[in-house]
Design a protein with these regions (language model features):
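Bacterial N-terminal signal peptides that target proteins for export
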Residues: 1-10
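A short, solvent-exposed beta-edge/loop patch
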Residues: 161-223
Length: 228
């Protein structure tokens, strides 16, 4: 069965065309909700932040250190991809096809290349009620990890997908999700890690090279939760 799914859900497939193959890190077992934010760290509470406020909380080159260059933001894409062989994504298809799954109106995003290569790390911030954020991102991760293997066709290019649930870092935020995605097209294979942390009314998603995601996740969450 085929289902049309918005690239909001599977936009990360573009990484296959940009990121060279990288080895997988050691992985955990099942993702679980994590306890509330670390002791002594600020939390977002119930305040819903504007997109402009979220933009100021994104990491920048100074936060990341030498070797990182922010990529220009591309215009929003409304193309869709075809998902083959994944019932979990089939069930999500109606919602995703309208762009509703991560269509939170208050959001900000930044993507960076590293050391002049195609290796990337990206950060997304969203703000809404805790319930909406939790249900929205939870539905996406459940669907994307609901099938160990499936295929997407993006821009006429067939891409083999393999997904693996990971245990999110403990002690970060109120809830956490993490997954490892392997993209295969022809002779090329790329591994991308994606970790999401919800803290109150704020949702952080860091995606990209597994090593870079692990390196910058804590820093991204600290800045996202910092009060001015």
């Amino acid at each position: 069965m085929r289902v049309r799914v918005a690239t909001t859900i599977l936009g990360i497939t573009a990484a296959l065309l940009a990121v060279p193959a990288c080895s997988t890190d050691s992985v955990g077992t099942e993702p679980t909700a994590t306890p509330s934010a670390r002791a002594g760290k600020p939390t977002s509470g119930t305040t819903v932040l504007s997109s402009a406020a979220l933009e100021t909380r994104l990491l920048d080159e100074n936060d990341l250190g030498s070797g990182y260059l922010r990529k220009p933001e591309r215009p929003a894409q409304h193309d869709d991809v075809t998902v083959i062989g994944c019932p979990a994504l089939n069930e999500l298809g109606g919602d995703a096809a309208t762009g509703g799954s991560l269509a939170f109106p208050r959001k900000a995003k930044a993507s960076f290349t590293y050391n002049g290569t195609a290796v990337e790390v990206s950060e997304e911030l969203y703000s809404d009620s805790a319930t909406k954020l939790s249900e929205g991102i939870g539905r996406i991760f459940e669907a994307m990890t609901g099938c160990p293997t499936y295929q997407v066709v993006a821009g006429g290019t067939p891409i083999g997908m393999a997904s693996q649930k990971l245990a999110p870092p403990r002690g970060l935020g109120d809830e956490g999700w993490s997954q490892l995605l392997t993209f295969s097209a022809g002779a090329r294979s790329t591994v991308v890690k994606q970790t999401a942390i919800r803290d109150g009314s704020l949702l952080l998603i860091v995606s990209g090279s597994p090593a870079l995601v692990d390196r910058h996740l804590d820093k991204a969450l600290d800045k996202a939760l910092a009060t001015s």
